[in-house]
Amino acid sequence: GCALVGSIAGVLFAGKLSDRYGRKVTMLIAALFFSVSGIGCAITGSFDQLVIARILGGVGIGVVSIVSPLYISEVSIARYRGRLVSLYQLAVTLGFLGAYLANYQLLHFSQSGAILGDGWMHTIFVSEVWRGMLGLSSVPSLLFFVVVLFIPESPRWLVLRNCDERALGVFQRIYLSTQEAQTQLEETKSVVQSEAKSDWKFLLQPGIFKAVLIGAAIAILGQFMGVNAVLYYGPSIFEEAGLSGGDALFSQVLVGLVNAVTTVIAVFIIDKVGRKKLVYYGVSGMVLSLLLIGFYFRFSISLGLPNNFLLFFFLFYVFCCAISISAVIFVLLSEMYPTRIRGMAMSIAGFALWVGTYLVGQLTPWMLQNLTPAGTFLLFAIMCVPYILIVWKLIPETTGKSLEEIERYWMKK
């Protein structure tokens, strides 16, 4: 809960920070928050210190969840942008998997009778192994910091700051052609110069404000379509269906594997199939699977349905979700908004997303108890309908379009 609170706080200032100081500097700051959090959790001397360390880590998560896909979008060639931004979601998925495996190994090590002396190593990795589990996050955090040191600043942000020569140099590294780089620089400058100078004035222009509202809507609606309920409460839901604790945990491992493998597939097809088609197919499959999961909980006893029925449609739901909204959401949010207010607008959408995550996390146990599992999954299915309507009616297909082309679309609305 502490990390989630920190994440909500982080997204609030991530966009403004990245718009003012640059994408690279903001990611470096987030990496420092990660590192301090991991080390702080490992050596904390009190519960209050642990809470503070977790909140700091959450702030870093919130910042990176906005700025990383934003940066990838701004340094990507249009025809590969969807694939490259989707790598962010893949990295998150693999990060979760890596954390699960690392924690499992640490727990196994601590229970194996290993002795690391009587000092702090024994405390962190054996007697109080939770310190090692939380502290290990400082390793990828420091690696992230080092990697970001060597990447270029976003060329579109550099144009916004009138650093045309530096921007041209970055475009040349991206396009490997001086002529293409010069053309992209001129197109970016043309669009930026047509924007209002005041960020808030520009954000409140009818077309741009519409894009911001749409982004926030799909961000929060996506959380109420059940994905985090499945990922957070999967074992409890499986036990509710009659599986033993061990079988429930094994089923959740299968959920995680399907999520990871499907995300890899999404990375390779998102620029070929298109963002909107993936949403149409994926969300339609989600509705079907959610209805059948609800059907199982309502009629499994009277019809004698096996537990494998539930497991199959759980996995099918995760497949449909991972190949559509999970892969597409950060791609759309990172390319929908104009350069001048991209960070600010993504912060608004990110805030909606994290608030939705928090609400679903808090409400799911209540819904499972009071609405019953059948009613809960029926509600998730109903929430898919406005999502797919918004994507169908209000969002343009952005596949293969430059960020400047997308910006012109919204400015004309």
Regions found by a protein language model. Name each.
Residues 178-190:
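Short, well-structured alpha-helical segments
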